[in-house]
UniProtKB/Swiss-Prot annotation:
InterPro entries: Class_I_gatase-like, HST_MetA, MetA_family
The organism of origin for this protein: Shewanella frigidimarina (strain NCIMB 400)
Gene name linked to the record: metAS
Top-rank taxon: Bacteria
Enzyme Commission numbers on file: 2.3.1.46
Protein's UniProt name: Homoserine O-succinyltransferase
Broad class of where this protein is predominantly found: cytoplasm
Keyword vocabulary terms for this entry: Acyltransferase, Amino-acid biosynthesis, Cytoplasm, Methionine biosynthesis, Transferase
Recorded GO CC terms: cytoplasm
Length: 314
């Protein structure tokens, strides 16, 4: 089934060229189907690139998905035009009374800044709090995963001596679980961050469960025991060249970055990159959307209330 996107969104042409099924709002409005409503809070600098990456994953699921793009209103984007933001993005005040099937909160290049020093931290906290009552399931990615664990569970991250960048091997750490259905025992995923959460601190928290981890990269997938919040410490949405583009950028800025691990052939930046995470990244988002959103969300979103669908089934 297609991902349903606003008419004329730039990502549409890219996705169609990759044979990913997308549908305009105009065409979808003529179908008698209740699409999943997913809100994306896009905190990444290059909005269009991140939109495309996430829509690519959502478009590979068997469900029709309608997407709203959300911005932090008083945070002007330096890398995306004002026209694009005003045309395709909504402010929180516009949607605060809405309910959604799912919410995705992206990463952000804020890994070395204390959460309380982030200029829009109060807005992030407000949206996270709102999501606990107005969204069936929330998917936090990379920086957002750290932010969510800090705000909701008072877990603190530790800064790394060097940026952790690369593609790392992970293993499942739980019994068969819907979020990992179809996963191999071991799989790869990209990471790009300056901090990490102490995996033992997560394990000891009574409201959290570690589903996948890496010897090199630590905790990867963490689930709240009420199944409402999914925290992914890496970037399953990254495309083939994303880590390379970040590396080249950092070299150009004189930051002397480490070469992304397990990414270039023979660990040589002059050679091609090796993609070995796309299938599991796609499966992760598909499982989340199916088992944690579609199977649990009310048909009429106005029926959503303070009790989550998971609690209603107890």
């Amino acid at each position: 089934m297609p991902v349903r996107i606003p008419d004329n969104l730039p990502a549409a042409g890219i996705l169609e060229s990759e044979n990913i099924f997308v549908m305009s709002e105009t065409r979808a409005a003529n179908q008698d189907i209740r699409p999943m409503r997913v809100l994306i809070l896009n905190l990444m600098p290059n909005k269009i690139e991140t939109e495309t990456q996430l829509l690519r994953l959502l478009g590979n699921t068997p469900l029709q998905v309608g997407v709203d793009l959300l911005r932090i209103h008083d945070k002007e984007s330096k890398h995306t035009s004002v026209d694009h933001m005003n045309t395709f993005y909504r402010d929180f005040e516009d949607i605060r009374n809405n309910n959604y099937d799912g919410l995705i909160i992206t990463g952000a290049p804020l890994g070395q800044i204390d959460f309380k020093d982030v200029v829009y931290w109060d807005h992030i906290r407000e949206i996270i709090d709102w999501s606990q009552q107005h969204v069936t399931s929330v998917l936090f990615l990379c920086w957002a995963a750290h932010a969510g664990l800090y705000h909701l569970y008072d877990l603190h991250r530790q800064l790394l001596a060097n940026k952790r960048s690369g593609v790392f091997n992970h293993r499942r750490t739980s019994d068969p679980h819907p979020l990992l259905r179809g996963f191999d025992d071991e799989f790869f995923a990209p990471h790009s961050r300056f901090a990490e959460m102490d995996i033992e601190q997560i394990r000891q928290h009574p409201d959290l469960e570690v589903l996948a981890e890496s010897d090199e990269a630590g905790a990867y997938i963490v689930l709240s025991r009420d199944n409402h919040n999914v925290f992914v410490m890496g970037h399953p949405e990254y495309q083939k060249d994303t880590l390379n583009e970040e590396y080249v950028r950092d070299v150009g800025e004189g930051l002397n970055p480490d070469i992304p691990q397990n990414y270039y052939r023979q660990d040589d930046p002059t050679q091609d990159t090796i993609v070995r995470w796309h299938s599991h990244g796609s499966l992760l988002v598909s499982n989340w959307l199916n088992y944690y959103v579609y199977q649990l969300t009310p048909y009429d979103l106005s029926d959503m209330n303070a009790k989550t669908p998971w609690e209603s089934k107890k």
